[in-house]
Amino acid sequence: MILISGYLDYRPEECDEVVAGLVEVSKRSLEDAGCVDYWWAADLETPGRFRFFECWESEEKFAAHRSQPYEVEFMERYVNNRAIGADAWAYDPSSRRSAMDD
């Protein structure tokens, strides 16, 4: 399993168009083989910042996702050519358990 988290920053006046792109990439990503979870959320304290979280069954499934044409297009259009700030981190958890257990 691999977890990815991070953020992308945009100019506030671009956010409506960016949200449309985030909705589309989310829908398609959730359909990819090996996608356990995938979401975006507007940062409540930083205007124009969107945080993301992804969970994939394996590094291989994540790599396959990154090579999908829609993902390549998203990265080019909304990250490489539009984001004014960005960072992301990958985590490789060694175990998984419920955080709701007593």
Across the structure, where does each feature detected by a protein language model lie?
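An amphipathic, aromatic/His-enriched active-site/gating alpha helix that lines ligand/cofactor pockets
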Residues: 24-36, 55-89
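N-terminal first-folded block
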Residues: 2-32, 36, 40
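Short, well-ordered beta-strand segments in beta-rich or mixed alpha/beta enzyme
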Residues: 2-9, 39-66
